[in-house]
Amino acid sequence: MLKLNKLEKQTIRPAAEVDDVCAQLCSVAVQFEDAWERKDIEFAADLEGAAYTQADPGLLELVWTNLLSNAVKFTPQGGSITLRQTRANGKIYVSVTDTGCGMDEKTIKHIYDKFCQGDTSHSTEGNGLGMALVKRILELTGAEMQIESTPGKGSTFTVVLAERK
C-alpha cells in the first residue's frame, strides 16, 4: 500500500534502465515454485529469450510478481498456469494465463480499482491493491495491459512493453 501511495504522489521516481525482461521473468517465476507444488498446479514457461526494454526493473518485477501471485491464488488445485514472453513489431508481450475462476466484463472493468477483489472467496489472501499498483507502474513505464477472461475457465493478462534493441 505504501509503494502505491508513493507512486501516486510521485515520491518514487522510476529509475529507467535497459533490462532483460526474460531474465526478470525467470527470476520471479522460480519464487512461486513451492506455491505451484502445494496446489499441484502445472506450470509452463514459454519464453523466447533475451528481450530488452527500458524501464525500472524493480517496478517491473512487482508487475510480474503480482500477476503470477494472482494466477496462483485464483487457480484451483490441479489447474495450470502458463507464462509466455514473445516479441513482435518492436514490442515485448508477456502473458500470464491461468485456468482459474475467470471474470465477467463487470469485474474486469473494476479490476484496477483500489481494494477491488474480483473473487471475494479469496479476500483473506490479499488487500485488493495489487492490480491498482500494476496499473500505476504500467502508466509510468508507458506499457499497457490487455485482459481476456471467461468466467469458470480462466484469464489471460498480457503486458505490452516497448522493445529496446
Regions found by a protein language model. Give the residues of each.
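Helix-loop junction within the histidine kinase core
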Residues: 5-16
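Conserved catalytic submotifs in the C-terminal HATPase_c
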Residues: 15-19, 37, 42-52
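Glycine-rich G1-box
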Residues: 34, 101-102
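Short helix-loop "hinge" at the ATP-lid/N-box region of the Bergerat-fold HATPase_c
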Residues: 71-72
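Short conserved segment of the HATPase_c
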Residues: 103-115, 135
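Glycine-rich ATP-lid/hinge loop adjacent to the conserved G-boxes
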Residues: 116-126
